[in-house]
Amino acid sequence: MSDAPSSSPDATASHWCYHCNKRVVVETLDDFVVCCECNKGFVESIQPTPAAYSSPAPPQPLSPDLNVEDSSIGSHFLQMLRLLAHAPSQRSPPRHLDVLSYEDDFFRLELNSRNEIDDDEDEDEDDGDEEEEDEEENLTVNDEEDEEDDLRRRNRFPLTTTQSRTGRNRILDWAEILMGIEDNSIEFRMESDRYAGNPADYIDDAAGYEALLQNLAEGDGGGGGGRRGAPPAAKSAIEALETFEVSSSEGEMVMVCAVCKDGMVMGETGKKLPCGHCYHGDCIVPWLGTRNSCPVCRFQLETDDAEYEEERKKRTSTVSDSAAASSSSSTSRY
């Protein structure tokens, strides 16, 4: 075997090594480019970076439509967005990578490896059986390395393509954001104490929360100004309820108290409302102490609330008048 030819290292890191995953200096060995660090041939020449990506563009002056001073928060915010939009990506692989470049590199590696194999066969065709076995082992190793290089190249191609597209999309997104900010008049101001809507709808401190909880409790508790529904029945109306004793005839009807859902047995006493429904005395009296209506038919007893009684009379008179009018109209038709 002859000595390896002299190498001519490239002074600048103009290639990307996919084995080292960084920019490297390469050596040229008979038109075969290898990495100086890992001595692998899985390298790619980096195209010259376009001027658009070479250096970040200087911040442009703010649009006069914003009417914001240079020392304001809006000015610094827009400048920061512009710097982020033009910031170059760090340690990114070559940008101009396509399918043809990968295929060309693959064929170049394949041809170089095959040429080396042919040269080895020509030089070693007079050697013994041991050298032939070594040559077969070398061929197997080279084929395995070629397959590994091919697999790595195919796995890295979607990743590098996605990274390059993501970088371009990121710049376009920032450009759209900046254009939208400059096209629309946006006022940058510090947080103020002004409210949107009615200031009474806001709760600023613990006292406000306590007042809110108190109002909710009063609304659900049924006492004070938060009472809902009809008022309790008058004490005179409760005392005037008819008391009866369950007889044999009534026991056969299987009377059931609608409050406790228990049957009333023969010989037991109960209370009867004017509507005719019967209950246990211990059940209906507490019920009427909170509301004046019958649990079954909603018949209303008198109350001690004068305002409620006045409204009930008005409703009753209105219903009676409408019923009389409807009956008279139906009679006139016939």
Swiss-Prot record:
Tissue: Expressed in both light- and dark-grown seedlings.
PROSITE patterns listed in its UniProt record: ZF_RING_2
Keyword NAD included in the entry's annotation: no
Listed result of changing residue 283 to A: Abolishes interaction with COP1 and ubiquitination of HY5 in vitro
Cellular component GO terms held in the UniProt record: cytoplasm
Pathway assignment: Protein modification; protein ubiquitination
Comp. bias regions, Acidic residues: 117-149
EC number of this enzyme: 2.3.2.27
SUPFAM superfamilies: RING/U-box
Pfam families from the UniProt entry: zf-RING_2, Zn_ribbon_19
Function: E3 ubiquitin-protein ligase that mediates ubiquitination and subsequent proteasomal degradation of target proteins. Probably forms a minimal ubiquitin ligase complex in cooperation with the E2 enzyme UBC8. Its interaction with COP1 suggests that it may participate in proteasome-mediated degradation of HY5 in vivo.
Domain remarks: The RING-type zinc finger domain is required but not sufficient for ubiquitin ligase activity. It mediates the interaction with the RING finger of COP1.
UniProt name for this protein: E3 ubiquitin-protein ligase CIP8
Species annotation: Arabidopsis thaliana (Mouse-ear cress)
